[in-house]
């Protein structure tokens, strides 16, 4: 015969008393190592009784009053388990607090050590950086002075180059003018030479013509004289 408690639990959708006990028993089995010896003996004794009664009930059947006894016993076991869990929680809290305290002390010590090391390292490198930056500033000042000197020299050289370009431009202009005058003079000279040559050629031609005429006249006179002489010799 099925008990009314079981019917009610199944209809309501809640876990049965046996399921609750089984879950509690499983949970307690996992945590046995952390409990004291007396608590384990109590739980094991009650668990054995419950298991024995469950076997009797499954083999021969149990009346509905047995369900109430089992329920009461399970409630007692649940109270013991809750006490054990509460004690375990308290011990765990104590261990946790002690561990946290120790960890915090270690962390504070490590943090302080690291902070001191960082501060020492920062001071050391800050001094080195400060020295380097000071040297850098001096080098920059020297570089700026050198740059200013170079710029002044460059300006002077640029001014000299500009003046030199002006002088060269003037000289080139003078050379150009002189060259133009030279070309013009050469052209005039060649023109004069051409005129002189033409005049000389004309004069030479005239002289040659006069000379030729003179030679011809002399030749004629000689021929006439020769003819006269020949005639005279023939006549006389």
From Swiss-Prot:
Segments forming a coiled coil: 66-223
Region (Important for oligomerization and fiber formation): 69-74, 231-236
Principal location listed in the UniProt entry: nucleus
Motif (Nuclear localization signal): 88-91
Tissue and organ expression note: Testis-specific.
Location of the region described as Interaction with DNA in the Swiss-Prot/TrEMBL record: 52-57, 88-91
Listed GO CC annotations: chromosome, centromeric region; lateral element; nucleus; synaptonemal complex
One Gene Ontology MF term: DNA binding
Alphabetized Pfam families for the sequence: Cor1
One biological process term in Gene Ontology: meiotic cell cycle
Disease involvement: Spermatogenic failure 4: An infertility disorder characterized by azoospermia, a condition of having no sperm present in the ejaculate. Testicular histology shows arrest of spermatogenesis at the pachytene stage of primary spermatocytes. Pregnancy loss, recurrent, 4: A common complication of pregnancy, resulting in spontaneous abortion before the fetus has reached viability. The term includes all miscarriages from the time of conception until 24 weeks of gestation. Recurrent pregnancy loss is defined as 3 or more consecutive spontaneous abortions.
Protein task: Component of the synaptonemal complexes (SCS), formed between homologous chromosomes during meiotic prophase. Required for centromere pairing during meiosis in male germ cells. Required for normal meiosis during spermatogenesis and male fertility. Plays a lesser role in female fertility. Required for efficient phosphorylation of HORMAD1 and HORMAD2.
Full protein name: Synaptonemal complex protein 3
Originating species: Homo sapiens
Gene for this chain: SYCP3
